[in-house]
Amino acid sequence: MQPQNLPPRDDPVTAAALAARAGDPAAAARFVRATQADVWRLCAHLGDPGEAQDLAQETYLRAFRALPAFAARSGARTWLLAIARRVCADAVRERRRRPRLDLTADLPDAPGQGADLGDGLALRQAVAALHPDRRDAFVLTQLVGLSYPEAAEVCGCPIGTIRSRVARARADLVGGLAERRLSAPGAG
């Protein structure tokens, strides 16, 4: 995450992106290394976790194609995560056009898979069920770790809108998880 007090050009990630734009392959590698965990995490939460690596690669392909136009008006990490968000949105639209079969639906759980796996799956499903604007704001701020101003820039909306979307996403998640627990087999 870009420190709040650094102008975009003084940020090491942005400096690496600008050097990569000028043709420095070592700077391009530094740029990818510095951002790959955030890009993958965003892709895993906004897209299909099984496709996160492919979505991250597509993000970098688009970013390096667009790098000549990058003017550093914002930080490079923010710019890159905005690209990743669009890549994930494109993937979701494509997936809706082509339904997939769930080949694991009838497989029994492996021994030792307990509540932790079920809770993690329930949380992932609850996040996936959020309204897309709320999910984006929640994932960017709570899972990727962007500040509210950075998330607002990625989403192209005011900071107050991000704050309200995150608050509503939290309320939706609490309500959705409580509802799942009450409707689970064997629940009280």
Residue ranges, per PLM feature:
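Structural recognition of an alpha-helix C-terminal capping motif at a helix-to-coil junction
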Residues: 54-61, 74-86
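DNA-recognition helix of helix-turn-helix
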Residues: 85, 89, 143, 155-182
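Internal acidic/polar
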Residues: 6-13, 90, 98-120, 124-125
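Arg/Lys-rich amphipathic alpha helix in sigma70-family domain 2
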Residues: 65-72, 82-103, 116, 168, ...
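Amphipathic, Lys/Arg- and hydrophobic-enriched alpha-helical face
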Residues: 32-49, 66, 127, 179
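Sigma70-family region 2
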Residues: 21-22, 45-49, 58-75, 94-99
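A short pre-motif secondary-structure segment
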Residues: 137-141
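Short, charged helix-capping/linker segments at alpha-helix termini
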Residues: 3-4, 21-30, 40-58
